[in-house]
Amino acid sequence: MGKTTFTYGRRRRDLGLVGCLALLLFSEQPVASQSRPLVRQWDEALGYYNPAALAPLGTGQIAGLWGREDHRHSYYLLLTYLPLELLGGRHVVGAQLLHHQQDLWEHSTFSLRGSACLPLSEGKRLQLGMEGTLHRLTFDGKKALEEGITNSELPTTKSEGKALGLSLGLQFYGERLSAGIAVTDLFGVHTRIGERYTTQLPPRYSATLSYHIGSAVAWAFVPAIWGSYSQDERWRSEVRGTLWYHARIALGSSYRPGEALGLHTRLRLGELSLGYQV
């Protein structure tokens, strides 16, 4: 199973474009009505997990991600970040659009987020992030009946429900060290579909840590770790290490305990970055 990514970006105040192609596994059961897609390329779109980890200061960015297992299980994710100077400080605002197809369910979200920067010392800063999300969940009850799926609580027509969510994050950036913690949908998400069915999406807690060893003009090694926990997904984690040459060519590996060992590579050509993960 492979993954490809491409990145295009400009430093300072220009806009960039990030995209990635990923293959993910989703549940086959229609009662698993509401879940979050697992974005394996978390280092490409860290803002998906942490609203404080937006684009670097002075940088704008547009990101697009798409993943698919088959025609019944897929997602796409669009993110955008823009720098903002407010009250004498430099901050970041952004938005996110997610559409997650899960067999007979469609989960769409629209989020607005902001990240306030607190300078600590030269080369170090702390970012505080907040995100508000509108969730929209749709169930195709008519198609479920055609496929022989019955549940007395589920509607027999195409129905939808809406709910709101709140997420918080904290991200530290140093000269070499980067670390962050976040909670997605702090109070959980309770969505009512039809007259008798209610689905719940519990909070998700996540953390990341990375460290830059070496020089940007020669060889560099970047070890990183990501982990998350929620009541429905339990513990998930990934450890990865990436070796960079002149900040242009990268080769690394990743390991997800109990799941898989992967390899990834990346090539930067000016402002364009191409990558592949398997």
Protein language model regions, located:
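N-terminal secretory signal peptides that target proteins for export/translocation
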Residues: 1-11
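Residue-level detector of transmembrane insertion/anchoring sites
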Residues: 4, 18-19, 175
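Bacterial N-terminal signal peptides
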Residues: 18-26
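Sec/Tat signal peptide C-region and signal peptidase I cleavage site
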Residues: 29-33
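Subset of outer-membrane beta-barrel
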Residues: 34-278
